[in-house]
């Protein structure tokens, strides 16, 4: 609960520094999971609701099934993805350790060239590299980050990414389902689509505070995508329901 609250504060609180990458390994699957849960489940529910003969119980069962299946699928996918990235990082760290042990001067020259290519004077780049090479572990981390673009700080943990994406997806998928658990008919339909679009709009605004995009444009984009998906599946459900009968 504390971790979830901290994440919400980071999203809807003051804008983060443009160079602050803390938590970015968890942010991506969390935001993607919530958005995917909202859009996929409202699309599923609207598609079934579009069939004129759809039993309200069928809508609820489909919504619950979509929530559970999507949540576990997101968790499995994120775990495998981040775990694979971690294994690649571990391999590159060990490879770099061997290279620093056997060809330190060559590695030193490579790092000097990297910093020089970024605009640093060569003399200054050599001084920086000299300080970095004095600490073997710092040197390994620097080489992996600068040469390959991998960093443990921005990658996150496989378990954290899996749990975050599953919870976010489930929470998002629950929004369009909730009205059908409490109500039925046109009112449940209206509240389901309205609640989903509102949640997508707020999610877009929250993400814009981290990406430094225009909040209104980001919110409307998220809500617009959800509306199009729901409208298409509702139309398909209506056509199929009419064709069957």
Question: What kind of feature is each model-predicted range?
Answer:
Residues 22-33, 56-64, 124, 156-163, ...:
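The feature identifies polytopic integral membrane transport proteins across all domains of life
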Residues 2-81:
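Internal alpha-helical transmembrane segments
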Residues 202-229:
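Interfacial loop-to-transmembrane junctions
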